[in-house]
Amino acid sequence: MANKTVKVGLVQLSCSGNVAENMEKTIAGVRTAAQKGAQVVVLQELFRSLYFCDVEDYENFKLAEAIPGPSTETLGALAKELGVVIVASLFEKRAEGLYHNTTAVLDADGTYIGKYRKMHIPDDPAFYEKFYFTPGDLGYKVFQTKFAKIGVLICWDQWYP
């Protein structure tokens, strides 16, 4: 098997409480990464909002969405336009009362390939993630994309290989 190089771009933003503004900043970041040659663009954890898990507030559940859903549709169209793979962490509403910290993978043709749900959920001062997220149930996943096979972990999962 021949070695090949895949250029990865990372988008890290300063988020606000405005979801639409954060999405626009993210789209701009993905465009910049693609212009610089990135083939795979990875977004920060829960990029659509401020990090809300530092407080327990039922209002924050309004930030959750279905996956696939509005954000994956927007990002899928962007992936197709730019010909890049996008790896995006989203607050998933699976069903009423059932929420996950989930990463969606969108291929370079805009296709939604699948998702990974964070399995290890911290609960420490300023990290009240168990208030919001149910542990993932999909196992560790590897996604075949146009450019590479991609395995996904979210934050604390890295400590449990």
Predicted feature residues:
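Short beta-strand segments enriched in small/hydrophobic residues
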Residues: A2-S14
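Hydrophobic positions in the central parallel beta-sheet of the AAA+
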Residues: G9-V11, V41, G151-L153
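Short, basic, glycine/proline-bearing loop/turn elements
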Residues: V11-G17, D57-L63, F147-I150
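Residue-level recognition of beta-strand->loop/alpha-helix junctions
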Residues: Q12-S14, Q44, R117
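Short, glycine/acidic-enriched loop or turn micro-motifs at the edges of active sites
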Residues: C15, R48, Y160
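Cys-nucleophile CN-hydrolase/nitrilase-fold catalytic domain and related Cys-dependent amidase chemistry
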Residues: V19, A28-A108, K115
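Active-site catalytic loop in hydrolytic enzyme cores
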Residues: E65, A77, R94-P161
